[in-house]
């Protein structure tokens, strides 16, 4: 179910909240901003403002009821004598206010957020779409056909807008391709000045002579690549403060507070701290705040280069069964839990918190499921990236051979021998076989549904360029060869920009991953050991002291380790999401694979450090 269908059902369910629905509709239409209406139009949501407002009110009510449930649990935990703990009162106030307000804000602002996301993603499609247009124009200086080619070959959101533009031209909304390009440039110029400039350069290039045209087209690509690189540089420079805030708010301050909780109980008898408040604060409130802050950071990330889509029909995915993987993961988690319980039964120890077994079980389940489900996708994605990296050099070798006037079959077999050992060489070898042995033409040798060499190549970039080659060869081998060599240069430019962007962001994302997967578990483990020492020391003080054992007695070591362990797991999810979002954008495959890979290591590290810290600090206690 998507946002629209949920919104419609929710709006019908919550109509009772507003009484006269017609009056509410009228009031809602007047109260929303023009930006809100534009966002609905841009995203294509067939919703009315009143439906979204009703859904937001209903969500706030549900969130309020959920917060009351948490408050009731805290009250029950304190036997309904809440006045004995200031910290519990603070947590109850925060949950009661924060949850409904967050729900109201998220739902009511969702169309704006979605529209902003779509615009950012479309801006990331610019290098690919513009490169298709430029590549086509170098082979055939027909502006309308170049736009049709880009709209047809690209699966990006910007290409959808191009298809809409071409349709508008067909039904005479725009009189000519020049008018259509002017409209499109002005429309997107609000968000991307470099796209506007590049489109005007492309439009002027078709009216120039051959050499000048190629120079202008090259300049348009340079403008786009420089603009994309500049955007990412600006974004990376602005990331320093937000990442520092996340590191402070998410790792250092919360984990330092863990060791302070026993000491805080000394301040006043009314600063009683229970496990329920710590659970709500660490495992619900704090992760929620971090989640929305991370979401805000990633919403400002400019998209760069779209990821290659992987169809479910891929041969390596045909036998993939997510339900089966979930069952296997569940069995693995059960086995780990069983072994842990057997170990505790025969080797009980005060330095080994039994709640660690629950963390192991979750880590085993999630890691097993993620790796078995997403490893095939990751392997395919890596193969596509490897082939695309090889393709620039391969295209240059192929283009040079065709430029010499050699027939396609000879050029492909020569390139396959020159690039022997690479994945793209196998594709070229198969193409040559189709041309020579099966007597196919170039297009069929590449794209035939049964025997085409690109049948199992899922890179839209490679497929689009090979279509250009097939079209160019029909007209002139020499001209096609020259164009392919120039296209190879463009491709290398694109790859160099991608690489430089990765290098710029690499230091930051590697620091985030190291913090999430190594430093946070180590700091948490050491802090839990210190907490154990402080608790033991304070509980050993005379009863006449200001510390009352009851203030901290309800935080049993097992529960405390479990709550902090859950928080560490949440940190691993959140910080890896931030690192993945900065590095790759919205790449679910890479994210889930990374979590599956890092989670067990981090939980094992947390376990070892916690046990060693408790053992070390226990020897120091009086």
Question: Model regions: which residues?
Answer:
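Hydrophobic alpha-helical transmembrane segments
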Residues: 80-98, 270-285, 346-364, 553-566
